[in-house]
């Protein structure tokens, strides 16, 4: 593929934008090469500035669950724009959004809109500390909760991609208030709570890790966290920025039957536009200003255009059997990819929850951050580029989940699998040639 226009833009971008991108993973540092620049998106496709089309399994990192540029979402945005872009004052759409989330996610009696997933998690932690009078928080290796200082300790997503255990600029004293546990380790959680449970304000967790690829909880693990938090009066926060309205209509908490105290949401509730929210029980949320003393604010929170886009999308995903079809499509994709890898003699495992999936280049199921980082990332990188050359775009990191949308029809899935069969065979052939070149010379 010729990416001359993308190359020119990337060179130009690096003169004004740090690293040439506005979020690190986009730079392709993990997989090598240079990013393509997008001109437009429609349905299951992205189109770059050089005229290439890609089947997209990134979906703007999750929110494009009905595909890109869906007519109903686009029309809702056009109507909203005709009435103004931003008010800095309350609007009816904010109320409708809060009521919709509360109806679909019963743990959220009340909801506060913010502008991003990071804002949502930062606000939830402040609320937890203010409401409990405690300072320590617990997170898990490989989980990513945005770029707030408290969270950049063994974080997932871009932190994991760049191999950074933390970030310069995070005060050591603040880091001491963040305790990191191994996800899916029952005994480690129990031991920590027995040692210092009464000093912990909150446990924040991705109920399905989506920022160290796609790692579901072991049976009973989320309930174990719920039991410990209840016993020690610790708030349990589910970061559903990725899983909310993605793995099930009611999110991961509905799928696994575990009720958190607070939930954070991301851009899926804005139809892909910049937005976030956090919610919980009424007694807890009443601590937020102006109802209570814990301050949180935002000029653009509840933006009318974002609310309109989000409401249109939330209406679409309530269609009968929406999630059944989404899950079936993702399962067909994962099964086909695993079969294609196996036929080429390549070890690969897939993991899938609803419309969210992960590709691990290993022959083992992955249940922890350590297992995820032990996978063959070089082989993933080769697969990524082989698929990109064939017009299929997966996340440019071995540590990011993939996403499917309702626009990914059976024909789209089959086109992806056809590309994958060719890609895996190419990788297998390259490996065979390399193996032969490294074999010791046979003496006559």
Swiss-Prot record:
Pathway: Porphyrin-containing compound metabolism; protoporphyrin-IX biosynthesis; 5-aminolevulinate from L-glutamyl-tRNA(Glu): step 2/2. SUPFAM superfamilies: PLP-dependent transferases. The modification N6-(pyridoxal phosphate)lysine is found at residue 267. Its cofactor is pyridoxal 5'-phosphate. Keywords: Cytoplasm, Isomerase, Porphyrin biosynthesis, Pyridoxal phosphate. CDD domains: OAT_like. It comes from the Bacteria. Its EC number is 5.4.3.8. NCBIfam families: hemL, PRK00062.1. This is Glutamate-1-semialdehyde 2,1-aminomutase. It comes from Xylella fastidiosa (strain 9a5c). The lineage of its organism: Bacteria, Pseudomonadati, Pseudomonadota, Gammaproteobacteria, Lysobacterales. The gene is hemL.
């Amino acid at each position: 593929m010729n990416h001359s226009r993308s190359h020119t833009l990337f060179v130009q971008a690096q003169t004004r934008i740090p690293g040439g991108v506005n979020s690190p993973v986009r730079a392709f540092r993990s997989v090598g090469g240079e990013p393509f620049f997008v001109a437009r998106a429609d349905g299951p496709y992205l189109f770059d500035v050089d005229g290439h089309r890609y089947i997209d399994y990134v979906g703007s990192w999750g929110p494009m669950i009905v595909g890109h540029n869906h007519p109903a979402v686009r029309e809702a945005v056009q109507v909203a724009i005709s009435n103004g872009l931003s008010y800095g004052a309350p609007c009816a759409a904010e109320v409708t959004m809060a009521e919709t989330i509360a109806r679909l996610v019963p743990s959220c009696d009340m909801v506060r809109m913010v502008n991003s997933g990071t804002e949502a998690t930062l606000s939830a932690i402040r609320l937890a500390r203010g409401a409990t009078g405690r300072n320590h928080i617990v997170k898990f290796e490989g989980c990513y909760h945005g770029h707030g200082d408290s969270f950049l300790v063994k974080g997932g997503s871009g932190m994991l991609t760049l191999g950074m255990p933390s970030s310069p600029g995070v005060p050591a004293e603040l880091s001491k208030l963040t305790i990191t546990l191994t996800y899916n380790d029952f005994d480690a959680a129990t031991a920590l709570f027995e040692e210092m449970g009464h000093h912990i304000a909150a446990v924040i967790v991705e109920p399905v890790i989506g920022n160290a690829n796609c790692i579901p909880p072991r049976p009973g693990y989320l309930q174990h966290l719920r039991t410990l938090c209840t016993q020690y009066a610790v708030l349990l926060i589910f970061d559903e920025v990725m899983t909310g309205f993605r793995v099930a209509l009611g999110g991961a908490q509905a799928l696994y039957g575990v009720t958190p105290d607070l939930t954070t949401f991301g851009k899926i509730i804005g139809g892909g536009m910049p937005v976030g929210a956090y919610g919980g029980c009424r007694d807890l949320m009443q601590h937020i200003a102006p109802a209570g003393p814990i301050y949180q604010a935002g000029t653009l929170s509840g933006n009318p255009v974002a609310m309109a886009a989000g409401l249109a999308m939330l209406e679409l995903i309530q269609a009968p059997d929406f999630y059944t079809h989404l899950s079936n499509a993702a399962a067909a994709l994962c099964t086909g990819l695993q079969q294609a890898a196996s036929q080429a003699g390549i070890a690969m495992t897939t993991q899938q929850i609803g419309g969210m999936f992960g590709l691990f280049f290993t022959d083992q199921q992955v249940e922890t951050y350590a297992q995820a980082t032990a996978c063959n990332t070089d082989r993933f990188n080769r697969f990524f580029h082989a698929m990109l050359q064939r017009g299929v775009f997966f996340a440019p990191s071995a540590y990011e989940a993939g996403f499917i949308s309702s626009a990914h029809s059976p024909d789209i899935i089959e086109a992806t699998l056809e590309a994958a069969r060719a890609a895996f065979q190419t990788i297998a052939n390259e490996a065979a040639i390399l193996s032969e070149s490294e074999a010791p010379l046979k003496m006559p």
